[in-house]
């Protein structure tokens, strides 16, 4: 009953008003899976390729008709008749057909949408929720946990039209006992942050990921206003709520001068100097996780940063590792960072995503499941986080339904699993157990 009878793709719109690929996989017995590919703004140079048409007369060149042609043509032809339950084979067929290292022939957006739709169809055929099917594919059947959210409540960098250089300032509701309580705490801090910003005369428009995007005097001020909001919500910073940052430092790195330029506050740093600056912030605020704290190619600098901060906090590689096992292995072998950010579309298939999570966990690294800044209502990452017991998730703030869809799916899953999916809070963060 899990034989594929039809594969089709369509062009839909993401949260930034750009087209993306949505795929459907139909099986015998009437089972259907549907999934959409997300899209990033600050992308790592080694990510799998997102195929765009480049035809300026349609969607300003961002159309995905070429990727759709791959889904509806060679991919569909190759997958019809195959068993959807054999995810690794389905993914390998598409990877081999594409024939490139970075999926540039069909596009990672085409392959990923079909890969995820296939997993959903197989779960339906097995009569089980997606998270349960993912746990089986992961070789960890019946092992679940609810992830600690990193909620991006102030947006800067490439995710906002403001003067804040650091891309994400996040809160983690570590004092919560359940995912549902964590969501409530996050929402309360978010609403109090709006009041704090308004009281200071700051704008409360939101960025791509639903966080506020004000012009601030400095990056440190972002942490200061969040601290005020936490207190106003009746919570204790460092006990109930901890902080995390995504610097996305590649976006303000000058490769020629080998300098990190925080234009918003008029400061320029060397590689080690920027790591020292981050260390100062961790001494002033309870920051327990820093992502992409240096440029993706600054491996020497990351070695220094990991040595300096890695015993105390979580050092997450996003653009650094791009969910790629070959690059992650190099990081593990050289003691670079201690955590990986997991984004489906950086690598382009579910099977390869699961391999990256496994490699990280086997090496004692944590894995943080993540959305992209361009999202849809597709909430597959919620099931991925629970089904792999990853322990942490980044899926934006408490506004924009493209973000909230993931939190709502997590609430539903927690309700269904009950005590089978513990919420471990701060213990999930590297260096905090």
From Swiss-Prot:
Mg(2+) binds at residues 246, 291, 318. One of its GO terms (biological process) is glycolytic process. Its main location: cytoplasm. The keyword Metal-binding applies. The active site is at 209 (proton donor), 343 (proton acceptor). (2R)-2-phosphoglycerate binds at residues 167, 343, 372-373, 394. Keywords: Cytoplasm, Glycolysis, Lyase, Magnesium, Metal-binding, Secreted. GO terms for cellular component: cell surface; extracellular region; phosphopyruvate hydratase complex. Pathway: Carbohydrate degradation; glycolysis; pyruvate from D-glyceraldehyde 3-phosphate: step 4/5. Binds a second Mg(2+) ion via substrate during catalysis. It catalyses: (2R)-2-phosphoglycerate = phosphoenolpyruvate + H2O. It is found in: Cytoplasm; Secreted; Cell surface. Its cofactor is Mg(2+). GO terms for molecular function: magnesium ion binding; phosphopyruvate hydratase activity. Its EC number is 4.2.1.11. Gene3D superfamilies: Enolase-like C-terminal domain (3.20.20.120), Enolase-like, N-terminal domain (3.30.390.10). InterPro entries: Enolase, Enolase-like_C_sf, Enolase-like_N, Enolase_C, Enolase_CS, Enolase_N. NCBIfam families: eno. Catalyzes the reversible conversion of 2-phosphoglycerate (2-PG) into phosphoenolpyruvate (PEP). It is essential for the degradation of carbohydrates via glycolysis. This is Enolase. It comes from Vibrio cholerae serotype O1 (strain ATCC 39315 / El Tor Inaba N16961).
């Amino acid at each position: 009953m899990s034989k594929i009878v039809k594969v089709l793709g369509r062009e839909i719109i993401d949260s930034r008003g750009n087209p993306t690929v949505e795929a459907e996989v139909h099986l015998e017995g009437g089972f259907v899976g549907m999934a959409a590919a997300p899209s990033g703004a600050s992308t790592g140079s080694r990510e799998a390729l997102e195929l765009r048409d480049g035809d300026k007369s349609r969607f300003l060149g961002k159309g995905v008709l070429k990727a759709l042609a791959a889904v509806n043509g060679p991919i569909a032809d190759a997958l019809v008749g195959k068993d959807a339950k054999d995810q690794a084979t389905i993914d390998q067929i598409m990877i081999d057909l594409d024939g490139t290292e970075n999926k540039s022939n069909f596009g990672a957006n085409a392959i990923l949408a079909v890969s995820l739709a296939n997993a959903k169809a197989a779960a339906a055929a097995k009569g089980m929720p997606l998270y349960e099917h993912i746990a089986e594919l992961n070789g960890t059947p019946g092992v679940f946990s609810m992830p600690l959210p990193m909620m991006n409540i102030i947006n800067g960098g490439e995710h906002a039209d403001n003067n804040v250089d650091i891309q994400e300032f996040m809160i983690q509701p570590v004092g919560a006992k359940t995912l549902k309580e964590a969501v409530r705490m996050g929402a309360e801090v978010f609403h109090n942050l709006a009041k704090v910003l308004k009281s200071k005369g700051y704008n409360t428009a939101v960025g791509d990921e639903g966080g506020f995007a004000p012009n601030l005097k400095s990056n440190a001020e972002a942490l200061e206003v969040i601290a005020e909001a936490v207190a106003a919500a009746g919570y204790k910073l460092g006990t109930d709520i901890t902080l995390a940052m995504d610097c996305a430092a590649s976006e303000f790195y000058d490769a020629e001068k080998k300098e990190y330029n925080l234009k918003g506050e008029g400061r320029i740093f060397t590689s080690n100097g920027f790591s020292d600056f981050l260390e100062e912030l961790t001494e002033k605020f309870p920051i327990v996780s820093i992502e992409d704290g240096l440029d993706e190619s600054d491996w020497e600098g990351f070695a220094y940063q990991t040595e300096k901060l890695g015993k105390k906090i979580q050092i997450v590689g996003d653009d650094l590792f791009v969910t790629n096992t070959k690059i992650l292995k190099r990081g593990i072998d050289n003691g670079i960072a201690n955590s990986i950010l997991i984004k489906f579309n950086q690598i382009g298939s579910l099977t390869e995503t699961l391999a990256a999570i496994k490699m990280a966990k086997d090496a004692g690294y944590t894995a943080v499941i993540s959305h992209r800044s361009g999202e849809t209502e597709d909430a597959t990452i919620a099931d991925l986080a629970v089904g792999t017991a990853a322990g942490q998730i980044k899926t934006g703030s408490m506004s924009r339904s493209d973000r909230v869809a993931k939190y709502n799916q997590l609430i539903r899953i927690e309700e269904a699993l009950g005590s089978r999916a513990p919420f471990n809070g701060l213990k999930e963060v590297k260096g905090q157990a």
